[in-house]
Amino acid sequence: MKKVVLFDFHNTLATCDGWLDLEIRTLPGAVLRKLGEQGLVGSSAADASEEATQLFRRLRRSVHESGREVSAVEGTATVLRQMGIDVPIEEIERAVERLEYDLLPTVEMIEGVDHALERLRDAGCRLGVVSSAGYPPFVELALEKLGLRSYFGEVITSAGTGLYKSDPGIYRLAARLLGALPSEAAHVGDHPTFDVRSAREAGLAAVWFIPQAWRTAQVRGESWSDFRAGANPDAVVERMDELSDVIAGLG
């Protein structure tokens, strides 16, 4: 049994599609609309959400490529500067906070997660979360809402560490914070690149959790079978009630 088991957040512990879309695509445009409602930017700026989205997507691609993360607030501020919009950082922070907190009621636990965590904890595993979240308080509050926060010794985010999940260093850091070598840890997540491949490059075992949403969808224009073929996990689970036995089998 591994000493430490790490978990991705979205699509592994919980579902919150609106939050993910905000974090990776729509945040600056949504912030502009919030600021427009308060009269802090003009109507033309508030209506420029498509330009803001395109700039933000470009920024997110650079984060993926470099492995260097910027927070939700920093990323939004960067996009607004590129658009020539001057807004105090404090106003951006407040708008991001409101938008993120408004999505907390939409968070739902993946079926069986609570029982899987309990079994792993009872088996002596130390548990942690590794999330690519750009706004760390959301993950903490979501875990509290679901009654899961007490299971985890560490909640590690890309924004909190400055490391995106394309950098294997975030997984080595997480293992170290929980008192384990990478070889003594496993990571469970749904993304074949940022969860599976990156964790394995860090020296951890990688368990690919494949939720129903992945199995029934086309992913980035590829068929599911083609998408799955690009992963090389140590184990695969499709239901959380399988997880503790799979972790035990990793040695």
PLM feature spans:
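Active-site neighborhood of HAD-like aspartate-dependent phosphohydrolases
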Residues: 1-50
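Surface-exposed cleft-lining segments at the edges of enzyme active sites
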Residues: 98-107
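A short, well-structured juxtamembrane/interface segment
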Residues: 109-113
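Residue-level marker of alpha-helix boundaries and capping positions
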Residues: 22, 67, 107, 130, ...
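Asp-based, Mg2+/Mn2+-dependent phosphohydrolase catalytic module
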Residues: 1-5, 15-16, 33, 42-43, ...
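A metal-dependent, Asp-based hydrolase signature
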Residues: 43-98
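A generic alpha-helix surface/boundary motif
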Residues: 29-30, 73-78, 137, 169
